[in-house]
């Protein structure tokens, strides 16, 4: 059965993360049968990491605040998590299903495909987003 996505519900969750006035900094998109739907959301990145277990595949849209004291900016990451125990067929489908998620999640600085929990560490993601951001005008603090 072909995978579908609940676009309206996923778009509402996506916009909640994009809203700087919202405390929500992450949302997951999970499989409910053959349909991708919004999953959990929250204001604590560590709580997001707890969603990424070995038997799960999910997509996540996460907001990080970067920059220095003079210039704070929101950077967004699209994370595809594929747990170690996910079957080969489901792994393969995750790649094609991501195109459905990208119909909703269109603005992000960097995309990650992760199956190792170490790569979910906040410092790693932040450093990758900083690299993707181009020029570093924060040199005086280094």
Swiss-Prot record:
Record domain ADF-H: where: 2-130
UniProt keyword Nucleus, yes or no: yes
Region (Flexible and important for F-actin binding): 66-75
Gene3D superfamilies (UniProt xref): Severin
Keywords: Acetylation, Actin-binding, Chaperone, Cytoplasm, Cytoskeleton, Nucleus, Phosphoprotein
SMART domains assigned to the protein according to its UniProt record, in alphabetical order: ADF (SM00102)
Described function: Binds to F-actin in a calcium-independent manner. Has no direct effect on actin depolymerization. Acts as a chaperone for ALOX5 (5LO), influencing both its stability and activity in leukotrienes synthesis.
Official protein name in the record: Coactosin-like protein
Native source organism of the sequence: Mus musculus
Gene that this sequence comes from: Cotl1
């Amino acid at each position: 059965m072909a995978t579908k996505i609940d676009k309206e519900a996923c778009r509402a969750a996506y916009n909640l993360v994009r809203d700087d006035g919202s405390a929500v900094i992450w949302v997951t998109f999970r499989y409910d049968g053959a349909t991708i739907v919004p999953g959990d959301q929250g204001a604590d990145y560590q709580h997001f990491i707890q969603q990424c277990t070995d038997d799960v595949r999910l997509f996540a849209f996460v907001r990080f605040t970067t920059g220095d004291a003079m210039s704070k900016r929101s950077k967004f990451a699209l994370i595809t998590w594929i747990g170690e125990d996910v079957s080969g067929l489901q792994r393969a489908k995750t790649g094609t299903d991501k195109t459905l998620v990208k119909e909703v999640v269109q603005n992000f600085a960097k995309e990650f495909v992760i199956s190792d929990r170490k790569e979910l560490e906040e410092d790693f993601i932040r450093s990758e987003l900083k690299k993707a951001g181009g020029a570093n005008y924060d040199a005086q603090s280094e």
